[in-house]
Amino acid sequence: MSETLVLHLKVPTERFREVLSSLKEKQNFTASPSSQPKPQERPFQMKKPRAPYGMGPRAMKRREKAEKEKLGVVNDELAESSKPSSGAATPTRSAPKSSAGLINSGLRALDRSGKPCRRWEKKPISIRSISTIVWKLPLWIGTPDSIPNTPELPVKTTLDSVNEIAAALSTHAESSPMDATSPVDSMPESATGI
């Protein structure tokens, strides 16, 4: 909603004519080419309409690049199949070489204390049961020189310790009010499949 404002001014006609003539003179003065050189107006240039999504110049370049890579991979595969294998395969993409120095170079920023890395060794460990069955299992153990101040716990492997364990089990079985049964006997028949 636009509102129009009308003003009624009471101005003598002579004064009104003077104001109009002064305005016309100012317009003629600015419009005269001899007073000021006017810069040439450029014709109105319309902007290009925006390309639809996925059809712009960047998208077209990406699409062309992907097609070239795809064709390059296909051409390399065809070339490799026609050539006899020389032992070393050349990958189409550059991959890092798998040397220990390159793999661990990214890990240097993690530890800057200067402490040497802990070395791990695979050593067998033997576990002996009460029934004198011995199991030998592989175990990863850190080197003792790199373990800071960790006391080793003494392990009793003598026959006395086996006797102590057997005595403890027998006293536990005697103190229980129920008869000692095997785990299979206490299971329901449906679970055992009998």
Curated annotation (Swiss-Prot):
Region entry Disordered: which residue ranges? 24-107, 170-194
Task: Check the record and name the Pfam families matching this protein.
Answer: INO80_Ies4
Set out the biological process GO terms recorded for this chain's protein. Answer: chromatin remodeling; DNA repair; transcription initiation-coupled chromatin remodeling
Q: Which GO terms describe its molecular function?
A: DNA binding
Query: Which residues, if any, are the signal sequence?
Result: none
Which residues are annotated as modified residue Phosphoserine in the UniProt record?
S86
Report the protein name in the record.
INO80 complex subunit 4
